[in-house]
Amino acid sequence: MNTSNYKDEFNQLNKIVKSYSLNSLKDTLLFANNSKFKLPNLNNIPQYHNIVGLVNFRLNDLENSILDFEKAINLDPNFYSAYYNLGLLFFKTKDLKKSYSFLNKAINIKNDYKLARDKLIEILSFYEPEDENSNFISDIDKKIKQVPYEIDFSKEITDQQIINYFKNCKKVVLKNLEDLSYNKVQIYRTKSINLNCERHKAIFFEYNSIPKYCFECYKVVIESKNFYDLLKMSLIFDQITYFHKFNRKNMIDKKSETDVFKSIIYCQSLEEVFQVENETKKILSIYFDEQISIESKRGCHEYASKYPEYKKIFKKKSEMMLMPSEWLDNEKKYDLENTKDGFENSGVSHDTIKGISLNNFLVMNNWFNNQKIF
């Protein structure tokens, strides 16, 4: 349909997009619906349905969000942004097959669509497509999974073994992928539990209050003495079965003047975190000397900076900072404003597939570039 004479409609669409950036989601949705009532031809513009779909997606109204994105595609079958958004939406569900399929469609329409490419790479850490649905990205992922470690994980790992493995992976990737840039800098392996950190931090930054969930979020923090030991920890998290039952990640922490090479294991109780700390020390004694730091902590750095008492951890919970009861009201306000039904959406968590992936390699490559190695 020709929309070239829809000047008023596109001006109004720009106002809706601006509202999406500045105002609450529910106010933006009301504004968008009222706009369509005043200017019915907005219904003929795919970008209108796409922005409404994004609002509904963030409000966790997935059913209406899907309908909105599908309307955009019906109006313009080559509207790649709507396919991408459907890929993001289904990633938030258990249907990774649909997520992969929609992202694949977005890339087929726009070959240089890097956002879709990067999300597709991430999905391949959790999902293996059938051969008939493979594409050049999944083919690279399969090839890198076939690169042998040539490492004995029952004894100490040398720096040279890590270097050799990374170089072998890079040879495989460079044969098939020109652009090694990637939008992630942490290797995050998940298991069953969605920590929902995005919601919790949004509440903290809006209200200066720590959500209830975070008072029961504990972690074992491992600080490696150098970059190569961080790489070793990444492979150990993948290969040692004990760690597979936990959410865990590897990262370079840049909050201080010098880089800190961190590996984190997330735990669900005070008792569990101390158990995991002790077991982790036993396991890692095979690979590292006593200089490695292994410590139990609670919550995120941002919370502890604002409330120093929060980070203090003791074996008796009664000695630790408790959550002020009035902070629960802030959570209720946030969920009321940011979800369709006013209730927290914890979403789903996908189990990471064991083994290296293109996602992991590209994060490591970002680390190497950051450390100016090779």
Residue ranges, per PLM feature:
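Structured alpha/beta or helical-core interaction and ligand-binding surfaces enriched in interleaved
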Residues: 117-374
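Helix-start (N-cap) detector for alpha-helical repeat units in TPR-like alpha-solenoids
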Residues: 9, 46-47, 80-81, 114-115
